[in-house]
Amino acid sequence: MKKQLITFVALVALPVLTFAQTADEIIEKNIAATGGADKIAAVKTFQFDQSISIMGMDMTGKSTVVVDKSIRNDVTVMGQQMTTVVDGDKGWTINPMQGGTSPQPLPDDQLKTQKGNMHLFGTDLFVAKDKKYPIEFVGKEKLGDKDVFNLKVTRPEGVANYFIDATTYQIAGMNAKVTLQGQTSDIKIKYGNYKPMEGLNLPTSLDLENPSMPGPLTITVSNVVFNPKVDPAIFAMPK
């Protein structure tokens, strides 16, 4: 009778124990799959090129980031360059596509969103753990044909759900609510084409959907350079 009782308890407990993988365990495995905390933390600055495609229109871009401090994005479309910069708690932009040729301060909501991007792409969960953002394990589900773990992260700029591949523990996707120009919208990103880069494994393609955009946007990352010397003057707002 005792053996039967132990067997019964084991069978009942098995689904609970299988499901009870914690957010901390998932994040630790994600960080390990990315290359490890030491490798991620060692990146203080980085630059990369972007190829951007939306609705048959192709653009190119270059980004420079000083982790947790500054970011500059330059995007060229139809022969014109759009620039967006955040430096500390301030930001500015030049957008000739909207008739602007002189720098303008970034609105507060755009500033807040851009500040959330001042880290190495694909390392969001490392950042969430390091900054002690509230994290909740929602459960295991499907993202397309992949089994994924759903982690809800409350970031300063909004709530984001990260979908972690249950096999590779790499970030497969992210859904977030973002408020821009007074409008709250749902952003969806799919991460793919992970590649090894100096001991790190990072996504090099991102498919982004946002109801405010005319269609899906695809970003392809290339020419990543870690820890280049960055001149602080590139973040200064032109006079």
Tell what function each PLM region has.
Residues 1-23:
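Bacterial Sec-dependent N-terminal signal peptides
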Residues 19-32, 39, 93-158, 179-185, ...:
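Flexible, processing/modification-adjacent segments and terminal tails
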Residues 24-99, 137:
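N-terminal mature ectodomain segment of secretory-pathway/periplasmic proteins
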Residues 45, 132-134, 218:
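A residue-level signal for beta-strand positions that form part of recognition/binding surfaces
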Residues 47-51, 74, 92, 140, ...:
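Residue-level detector of beta-strand face positions
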Residues 54, 77, 143-144, 197:
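Structural motif
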Residues 63-70, 87-90, 110, 165-168, ...:
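A short, sequence-level motif marking secondary-structure junctions
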Residues 144-237:
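Gly/Pro-enriched, hydrophobic low-complexity segments
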